[in-house]
């Protein structure tokens, strides 16, 4: 079998490539990246004969249509703006796929994918991704699911790569429409830095203040898990949160152009370019990823609570920034192998909780050092 890894030499997805080389059984793994030198260097560094590098331009839709049919699975690690064209191309040519993020319009291709007897799974990272498996695990233990509370701490700097800066700024942008929580049968919009509460994450992250974040679990789980309430809250390191808050308070998310020394540009564009260039926005004392889920429901009519959380090796063992990136990249590798190994029976465009068995997903995570722990109690 052949796997195609889009953006496979990027900041996040290079860890997917490494994981595929170590754990997967593919006959060939092609690292497709716009930066061919980075892809070549990664392939040489890993030193696995199954790996090869190939130039790939995500702006060239025609090249996707020509390239994808030669593979058994397309693994998309590109920035989220390419989610929709990659999904569309996979479905047009009938090749299974998955990606690390989610774009709302992807779900519109569900029926077409079913007609091709194929599956595409958006959002197979940490959150969404591991969190979906956690929620499914808890839901499987309950007769009724009343409330799913997802909390994450993405401990990385705001701008280690352009795509990650886009994600950071989008999650706190005042015009982001998908910052929702679900309650009483309705999706309710929340502004940036609303819904504040304290969550105690495993060390080295510890207790952090989280707020509502726009994530797809809120959209999918009322339907897939029958949850009456769903929310996603998250945070970045304190110094990153200060940047997001400062930009909001001072109107720096504005897209209205201003004139600075004869140059017309919006405050947002100025800040984006500035944050990409300042060295401090690529630094953080702790690289880590914390996930904590509290799921409330009923068993035999009695109220219960299931708390699940993840733990992983510290940055000293996992190589600095890899302690963050692996939490996103490893699930993408696992998800791909489960599709091609025949462990995913779902068809269409489906979220992770509808595609993957949580127990099996956790087994594979544990092999790599990411351990999901659980406490179930009657209330």
Residue ranges and their predicted role:
Residues 56-70:
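Conserved Rossmann-fold cofactor-binding substructure of NAD(P)-dependent oxidoreductases
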Residues 46-60:
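Rossmann-fold cofactor-recognition segment
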Residues 141-379:
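C-terminal catalytic/substrate-binding lobe primarily of soluble NAD(P)-dependent oxidoreductases
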Residues 10, 34-37:
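Helix N-cap at the beta1-alpha1 junction of Rossmann-like dinucleotide-binding domains, i.e.
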Residues 4-19:
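N-terminal Rossmann NAD(P)H-binding glycine-rich loop of SDR-like oxidoreductase domains
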Residues 68-77, 97-99:
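N-terminal Rossmann-like NAD(P) cofactor-binding module of classical short-chain dehydrogenase/reductase
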Residues 62-63, 73-89, 103-106:
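Beta-loop-alpha module in the N-terminal Rossmann-like domain of NAD(P)-dependent dehydrogenases
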Residues 100-120:
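Rossmann-fold NAD(P)-binding glycine/threonine-rich loop
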């Amino acid at each position: 079998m052949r796997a195609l890894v889009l953006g496979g030499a990027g900041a996040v997805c290079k860890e997917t490539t490494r994981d595929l080389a170590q754990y997967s059984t593919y006959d060939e793994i092609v690292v497709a990246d716009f930066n061919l030198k980075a892809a070549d260097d990664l392939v040489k560094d890993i030193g696995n004969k199954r790996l090869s590098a190939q130039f790939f331009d995500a702006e060239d839709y025609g090249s996707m249509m020509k390239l994808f049919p030669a593979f058994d699975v397309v693994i998309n690690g590109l920035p989220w703006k390419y989610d929709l064209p990659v999904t569309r191309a996979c479905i047009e040519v009938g090749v299974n796929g998955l990606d690390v993020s989610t774009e709302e319009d992807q779900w519109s291709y569900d029926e077409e994918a079913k007609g091709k007897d194929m599956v595409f799974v958006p959002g197979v990272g940490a959150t969404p991704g591991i969190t979906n498996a956690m929620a499914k695990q808890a839901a499987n233990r309950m007769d009724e699911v009343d409330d799913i509370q997802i909390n994450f701490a993405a401990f990385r700097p705001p701008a280690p790569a352009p795509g990650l800066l886009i994600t950071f700024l989008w999650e706190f942008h005042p015009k982001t429409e998908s910052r929702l929580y679900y309650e009483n049968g309705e999706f309710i919009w929340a502004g940036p830095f609303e819904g504040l509460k304290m969550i105690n994450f495993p060390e080295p992250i510890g207790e952090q203040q989280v707020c509502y974040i726009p994530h797809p679990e809120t959209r999918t789980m009322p339907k897939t898990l029958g949850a009456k309430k769903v929310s996603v809250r998250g945070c970045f390191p304190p110094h990153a949160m200060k940047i997001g808050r400062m930009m909001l308070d001072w109107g720096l998310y504005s897209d209205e152009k201003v004139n600075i020394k004869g140059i017309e540009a919006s405050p947002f564009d100025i800040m984006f370019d500035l944050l990409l260039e300042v060295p401090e926005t690529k630094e953080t004392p702790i690289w880590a990823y914390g996930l904590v889920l509290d799921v409330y429901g009923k068993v035999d009519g009695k109220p219960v609570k299931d708390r699940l959380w993840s733990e992983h090796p510290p940055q000293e063992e996992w190589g600095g920034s890899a302690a963050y990136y692996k939490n996103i990249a490893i699930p993408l590798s696992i998800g791909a192998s489960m599709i091609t190994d025949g462990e995913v029976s779902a068809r269409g465009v489906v979220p992770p909780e509808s595609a993957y068995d949580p127990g099996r997903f956790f087994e594979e995570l544990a092999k790599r050092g990411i351990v999901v722990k659980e406490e179930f109690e009657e209330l």
